[in-house]
Amino acid sequence: AAIDVDDVIATFDYYAELAEGLDAQQDSNVPLPSEDFSARLRREPCGVVGLIVPWNFPMVTTAWKLAPALAAGCCVVLKPSEVTPLPELELAAIIAESGLPNGVFNLVCGTGLAVGAPLSADPRIAKISFTGSNAVGVQVMQRAAETVKGVSLELGGKSSLLVLADADLDLAVELACGGAFFNAGQMCSATSRVLVAEELEEEFLA
């Protein structure tokens, strides 16, 4: 838990600093090859974004989505997993004390059917970001397509570990075990398969 808390703090610190840098660049001149034209750089928020986060690393994944959205100037509707809403409820209390204007951050708890699906299809949402299973990701994309909104998906993957013939075998075994069993294997980047050079197979499995 301490690692997660440190990660969350570092994420918000990073994007807070980035936001200040973006403000300094607003309306800056863009060099062009011709003096007959001029251009200025202006970044604008895309609008209200919907963030749907998973249960396995709830607060960390929330920080990865929420901090950049706020840094970009977007208002946010956050839907935590119905299994693990408590970290986000605590975050909402912290945000309420921070002085963030009302309505910039909004937390809606509930199931995917009750909250996630309507959020994905709502025309007032300009962008939806979802982390979770492939099956639900398909549904999010389909509902978002109804209003042609921006979509970011991070879905369950197949993270292979390649052990080549010249690998440090002790390190390879350590990484394979750590990758497969860290957090009980309940994460999208868990080592779901190991591809080992044929000549190392027996020694690797021993």
Q: Which residue stretches match the model-derived regions?
A:
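General beta-strand structural signal in soluble alpha/beta enzymes
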Residues: L78, L107-C109, F130-G132, V151-L155
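Active-site pre-lysine segment of PLP-dependent enzymes
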Residues: E88-E97, G112-D122, A135-E146, L162-D166
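N-terminal Rossmann NAD(P)-binding subdomain characteristic of aldehyde/semialdehyde dehydrogenases
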Residues: A1-L66, L100, F105
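PLP-dependent aminotransferase-like
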Residues: G21, T62-G116
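Residue-level signal for inorganic ion chemistry
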Residues: F12, G73, F105, I128, ...
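A structured beta-alpha segment of the ubiquitous adenosine-cofactor-binding alpha/beta core
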Residues: S38-A39, L107-S129
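ALDH superfamily catalytic-core signature
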Residues: K127, A135-A206
